[in-house]
Amino acid sequence: MQLNASEISDLIKQRIGKFDLGVESRSEGTIVSLTDGIVRIHGLQDVMQGEMVEFPGNTYGMALNLERDSVGAVVLGSYEHLSEGDTAKCTGRILEVPVGEALLGRVVDALGNPIDGAGPIDAKLFSPIEKIAPGVISRQSVSQPLQTGLKAIDSMIPVGRGQRELIIGDRQTGKTAIAIDAIINQKGTGVKCIYVAVGQKQSSIANVVRKLQEHGAMEHTIVVSASASESAALQFIAPYAGCAMGEYFRDRGEDALIVYDDLTKQAWAYRQISLLLRRPPGREAYPGDVFYLHSRLLERASRINAEEVERLTKGEVKGKTGSLTALPIIETQAGDVSAFVPTNVISITDGQIFLETNLFNAGIRPAVNAGLSVSRVGGAAQTKVIKKLGGGIRLDLAQYRELAAFAQFASDLDEATRKQIERGQRVTELMKQNQYSPMSIAQMAVSLFAANEGYLDDIEVSKVRDFEDALQEYMKSQCAELLKSIDATGDYNDAIQAGLHEAIKKFKATHAW
């Protein structure tokens, strides 16, 4: 085979043309110390705050401390194979997690990797875990209700879409139970849910997932797990990862609900990281920016207006507002709400549901303290029928608690006080509700109407729950159309009032319980 001289010269010219003289510079450093998941790196000149740092063995870290002659980074995952002298490289990327519909029904870790054994997740989109919250102009006021299905909350402490409502109480007071009931109640409403478990036992997380599957709620839920056995770094970033997954739905004109269970453990993890990074400790040994830790997370829960949704979707979605509702959970020690983290989160959120150990142990569940619980913006979003019927319930309960304490010392009470105490006892009994049995708007309306109109006054306190159960069964079978109309419109008018009066009178005349 003979080669033509012109062919050879053409070939050489092609090769020369394709030759790339570009120089790629990459910042590299050396690990100088490695203790408790904290890496000190010397020589990383161009690293950003929060940037991903690459270590040998496909391991990554996150740069948190940028100092004059070294960088302090936290390793995400196991670090047993790393040692002093290893190379660390800048990636130029901020930590991202997969987002989108593909994650629904799955259990993932804080980095978005599946841990439920159901195969890989085919996620097309990724989102940075840290984002700036929507500005004032992008937001819209809270005006749509988010029904939790719990009488005590929807009637007295209503939650709106886009609100941040804190659930606070000691351990074993039913905080997680309220959040799980709220997730179960979103079935069929189109609201997507994200449950972020931080520092929980793996058995507890598995139990939550099983309950969600049993009640058909896993189809619209993503579970993000950073259990107690995970590193402090993963417990610290898990809530931000969950928030990024929720923002995907909000920014496309949908509604999402995120539960952080719980932010106390995230604050502990952040304190641990900060102390290992040798940041100066402050009150209760927390670092100075622990308020910012929670405020930048919770401010991302919001309701954004249609113009912002249209801008974010580049015109694909028009005329729809999006919302991300947050239910952060905080665990108190012996009911002390004046501790550092509880006061911080109370001041950031739009209200709190305060759960008491004494009420829980007395069998009043959910153990909501009506006097200390408040919803600062949810009233504007409350369903009309519940707002009308539940208005006096909160006052009745708060006054009853006050009088009940006083009545222990007084032997003879006047008629008005005695009536108020008796009414309070019945309302307290009525507010009790079993776990995993959320109620519809119409069912709540029936129970509240019966209490308001005095239909419980001649019922023994111990029989109130039986009366309510029997009444609900009767309404379901005999007055299905009335219930359907209340659920459909959420309105309260003379026709509905007359219908409820007639139905309850007929029930009391013909039924025993």
UniProtKB/Swiss-Prot annotation:
InterPro entries: ATP_synth_asu-like_sf (IPR023366), ATP_synth_asu_C (IPR000793), ATP_synth_asu_C_sf (IPR038376), ATP_synth_F1_a_nt-bd_dom (IPR033732), ATP_synth_F1_asu (IPR005294), ATPase_a/bsu_AS (IPR020003), ATPase_F1/V1/A1_a/bsu_N (IPR004100), ATPase_F1/V1/A1_a/bsu_N_sf (IPR036121). The keyword Ion transport applies. The keyword Cell membrane applies. It holds the Pfam family ATP-synt_ab. Its main location: membrane. It is found in: Cell inner membrane. The record marks 373 as: Required for activity. It is a peripheral membrane protein. SUPFAM superfamilies: C-terminal domain of alpha and beta subunits of F1 ATP synthase, N-terminal domain of alpha and beta subunits of F1 ATP synthase, P-loop containing nucleoside triphosphate hydrolases. Its EC number is 7.1.2.2. It catalyses: ATP + H2O + 4 H(+)(in) = ADP + phosphate + 5 H(+)(out). One of its GO terms (molecular function) is ATP binding. GO terms for cellular component: plasma membrane; proton-transporting ATP synthase complex. Belongs to the ATPase alpha/beta chains family. This is ATP synthase subunit alpha 1. The gene is atpA1.
